[in-house]
């Protein structure tokens, strides 16, 4: 009877929740831990001069050296955030090789268009890590973080890369460092092969700028896009803490200092940058030996892009981008010893992957002041967080299952490697649970907080620093996933996690903290002279955080297709700038305080055309972020991606495929008929979302006309009275996928009552109006809204959408294709509106089935051109420009 009871308890524990750590391990032998009470002569292993005793700190010791990686080009000084803090944050699971079934598979089922292996990335990679980095932290994640399938590695050992790898010697020469390093000897690696033990490393003594020595790594980028940059080097006894790396990205220059006293022999993340296709000096990384420190700089391989999985199991790789694989395989590619990722000797990748996440953290942190009793790379990682989703549901089909956190205090006599109590982990887990409940309830109504588990789970037991597992919500519960798939919910949840980490770290070190601000609003650019513009914006108050007030701002600029610079500080909420003629300027703004930096505003653009007498104002009205369409009846529930795939914040790696099973009665059934079951047609694809940069596409097209100045603004600036449309001869209102879908947590009405009034007044005064968007007519359903469509936009709508088989549009003496299906390059207009002319208006463009795509009105009172699809969804750059020139020729004529 006792055995039966024990069996039931264990099975229940294994089945509850996500089960990522639901493997119970035999308790390891207890060991004596190093005390954090150090004598004058005693110091942690590897401490050198980087640590000092701190009696007011919960740690009892502080790291006081240079941060692992510092962006020296960014003019922001963070004093009450997470600067010089090193954190480990990893999304759960990932693709793994199942030896018993001899195939690669997800660790969790495909439900509600995703799987936990994909879903938690969309919180951690898109929101949480950027927030932590904006607060100044260096963040390690054991899974590949770059959503980029391409990868280029340049290494000194591969002479075929010449001239992509070049050395320039000054007073000090580059030579072999006499230690092992990275070499790419093969396309794929079998179990146990370590690329960081197969090559060599270059080294040079430090010098001044005048006598510098350089190594240039110039990749041949296969496709223009954003690529993570990783560097590698060796840590030697006389390594310096400010090795200089210069990243040239689309001609822009960003300088980093890397502390080479730690982290040698693995990939070290610098940042993610825009690179142009091909091989040029505009896109490269330069390592110098410049430093005022007396020592050496080492340099090994440099990697551009996350790449495809290259770890072979039973003769096959996963066939997916590395970022979708489990930590086990990334650890091998990153040079970790087999003890980190291969304890089961290739017999059980599932268990090895679970343990790899924590062992990677310990390997990096070993020898630092926070993990002094282990050998490792001496990176002072001080906190570990595993972000998961759980399993479970309520039979009423409507109640949220909610959030759970996990810690482990009863292990190794209740202390961590440095000697501090494991109760700090419990404090962290408790704060995560209650803080998230408070923040989510304040924003979305009552949120369910389940409990704090103090149990034996791998990712809360193995880390030798304070740690917790956060089970965000249940991926098996549709009421939970209605929240979870909404990008606005993800932002709020991630911000709550970031704030908890901020407060916890500050408490551990007995320091003050300030919460980073929210992004500014009402961003706008207006001409105040023939070649001078004023940029202005307003702060956004965070009612939940009194400290989250901006004290200054950062203005980021890019020129004519180049990458953005590292920002210029602005004290107030406006600035002036002189524009050079015929150059496309793009701008973003962030809010800044002592705690860090906000997310950016939308991207706005400006062009000064020499001799221009008229200015066109581009109004960005596309701010929508949403889950896929929600389908919910008495008997069915789920996401209907065919009706509307939703809009993510930038690209996403979170979709596995469309949901195919909606029957509520099959809740909890693990089969193709089970509620939420989804396909796999989208796995491995990075689906484009809202990049918030479409004013640039419109400005480029207007610029091709060679006649007009271009200004731009957010639609909020128009609706709040900051920008007066009557000041502009022509207005280009882009609405993209904007619509009030009825299920998103933020309403995104195409034409609010206020905007209807403003556009009515603008046209009555003789304005010239261009409007484009997928739902400009279908989103207007009331009688008054239909009257606005008829009387102002001169269009009518009968509920029609062209077949998705039709991607071609004709008219205006040309034809072109638009994005109709979701893809990796640009968001898609899956359901554009079919428009009908009213009165004297006429069809200017037709869909492939002959129905109206655009309606033009050439009145004596005003002129308008209304498109039932987003202008920026025209695929061809040259066609976009030609169509815009034709539209402007029509609108701007007297």
Q: What is each PLM-predicted segment?
A:
Residues 655-787:
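Helical hinge/lid and interdomain linker segments adjacent to catalytic or ligand-binding clefts
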Residues 285-296:
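Short beta-strand-plus-loop segments that form exposed binding edges in beta-rich domains
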């Amino acid at each position: 009877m006792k055995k039966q009871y024990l069996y039931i308890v264990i099975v229940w524990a294994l089945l509850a929740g996500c089960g990522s750590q639901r493997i119970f391990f035999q308790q390891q032998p207890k060991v004596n831990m190093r005390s954090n009470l150090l004598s004058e002569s005693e110091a942690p292993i590897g401490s050198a001069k980087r640590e000092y005793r701190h009696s007011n700190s919960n740690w009892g010791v502080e790291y006081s050296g240079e941060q692992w990686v510092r962006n020296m080009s960014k003019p922001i000084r963070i004093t009450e955030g997470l600067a010089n803090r090193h954190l480990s944050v990893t999304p759960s699971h990932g693709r793994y090789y199942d030896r018993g079934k001899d195939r690669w598979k997800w660790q969790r089922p495909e439900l509600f268009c995703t799987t936990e292996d994909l879903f938690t990335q969309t919180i951690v990679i898109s929101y949480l890590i950027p927030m932590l980095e904006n607060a100044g932290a260096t963040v390690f994640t054991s899974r590949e973080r770059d959503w980029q399938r391409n990868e280029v590695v340049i290494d000194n050992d591969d002479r075929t890369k010449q001239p992509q790898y070049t050395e320039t010697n000054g007073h000090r020469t580059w030579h072999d460092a006499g230690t092992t390093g990275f070499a790419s000897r093969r396309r794929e690696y079998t179990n146990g092969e370590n690329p960081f033990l197969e090559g060599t490393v270059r080294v040079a003594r430090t010098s001044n700028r005048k006598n510098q020595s350089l190594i240039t790594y110039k990749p041949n980028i296969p496709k223009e896009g954003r690529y993570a940059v990783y560097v590698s080097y060796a840590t030697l006894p006389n390594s310096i803490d400010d090795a200089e790396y210069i990243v040239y990205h689309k001609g822009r220059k960003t300088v980093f200092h890397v502390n080479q006293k730690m982290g040698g022999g693995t990939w070290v993340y610098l940042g993610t940058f825009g690179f142009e296709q091909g091989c040029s000096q505009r896109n490269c990384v330069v390592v110098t030996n410049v430093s005022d420190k007396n020592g050496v700089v080492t340099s090994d391989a440099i990697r551009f892009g996350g790449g495809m999985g290259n770890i072979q199991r039973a003769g096959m790789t996963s066939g997916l981008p590395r970022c979708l694989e489990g930590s086990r395989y990334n650890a091998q590619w990153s040079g970790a010893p087999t003890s980190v990722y291969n304890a089961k000797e290739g017999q059980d990748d599932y268990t090895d992957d679970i343990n790899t996440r924590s062992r990677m953290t310990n390997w990096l942190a070993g020898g630092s002041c926070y993990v002094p009793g282990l050998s490792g790379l001496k990176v002072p990682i001080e906190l570990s967080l595993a972000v998961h989703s759980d399993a479970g549901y309520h039979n009423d089909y409507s109640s949220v299952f909610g959030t759970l956190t996990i810690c482990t205090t009863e292990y190794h006599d209740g202390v961590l490697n440095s000697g501090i109590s494991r109760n700090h982990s419990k404090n962290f887990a408790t704060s995560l649970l209650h803080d998230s409940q408070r923040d989510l309830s304040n924003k979305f109504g009552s949120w369910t907080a389940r409990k704090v588990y103090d149990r034996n789970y791998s990712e809360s037991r193995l880390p030798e620093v304070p740690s917790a597992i956060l089970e965000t919500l249940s991926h098996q519960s549709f009421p939970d996933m209605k929240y979870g798939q909404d990008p606005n919910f993800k932002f709020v949840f991630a911000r709550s996690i970031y704030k908890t980490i901020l407060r916890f770290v500050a408490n551990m070190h007995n320091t003050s903290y300030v919460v980073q601000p929210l992004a500014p609003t009402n961003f706008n650019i207006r001409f105040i002279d023939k070649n001078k513009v004023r940029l202005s914006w307003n702060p956004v108050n965070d009612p939940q955080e009194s400290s989250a007030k901006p004290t200054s701002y950062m203005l980021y600029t890019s020129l004519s297709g180049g990458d953005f610079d590292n920002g210029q500080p602005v004290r107030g909420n406006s600035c002036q700038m002189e524009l050079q003629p015929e150059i496309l300027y793009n701008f973003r703004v962030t809010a800044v305080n002592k705690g860090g930096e906000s997310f950016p505003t939308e991207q706005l653009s400006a062009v000064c055309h020499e001799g221009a007498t008229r200015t066109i104002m581009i109004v960005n009205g596309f701010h929508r972020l949403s889950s896929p369409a929600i389908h919910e009846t008495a008997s069915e529930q789920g996401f209907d991606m065919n009706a509307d795939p939703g809009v993510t914040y930038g690209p996403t790696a979170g979709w596995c495929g469309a949901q195919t099973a909606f029957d509520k009665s099959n809740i909890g059934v693990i089969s193709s008929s089970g509620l939420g079951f989804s396909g796999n047609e989208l796995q491995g694809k990075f689906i484009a979302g809202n990049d918030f940069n479409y004013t640039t596409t419109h400005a480029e097209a207007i610029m091709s006309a060679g006649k007009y100045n271009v200004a731009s603004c957010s639609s909020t600036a128009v609706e709040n009275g900051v920008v007066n449309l009557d000041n502009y001869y022509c207005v280009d209102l882009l609405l993209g996928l904007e619509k009030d879908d009825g299920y998103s947590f933020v309403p995104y009405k195409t034409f609010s009552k206020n905007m209807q009034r403003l556009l009515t007044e603008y046209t009555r005064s003789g304005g010239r109006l261009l409007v484009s968007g997928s739902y400009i007519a279908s989103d207007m359903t009331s009688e008054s809204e239909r009257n606005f469509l008829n009387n102002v936009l001169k269009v009518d709508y009968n509920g029609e959408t062209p077949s998705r088989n039709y991607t071609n549009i004709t008219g205006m003496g040309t034809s072109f294709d638009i994005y109709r299906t979701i893809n990796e390059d640009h968001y898609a207009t899956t359901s554009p509106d079919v428009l009908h002319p009213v009165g004297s208006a006429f069809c200017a463009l037709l869909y492939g089935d002959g129905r109206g795509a655009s309606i033009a009105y050439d009145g004596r009172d005003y002129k308008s051109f209304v498109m039932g699809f987003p202008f920026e969804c025209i695929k061809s750059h040259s066609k976009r420009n030609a169509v815009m020139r034709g539209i402007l020729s029509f609108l701007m004529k007297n």
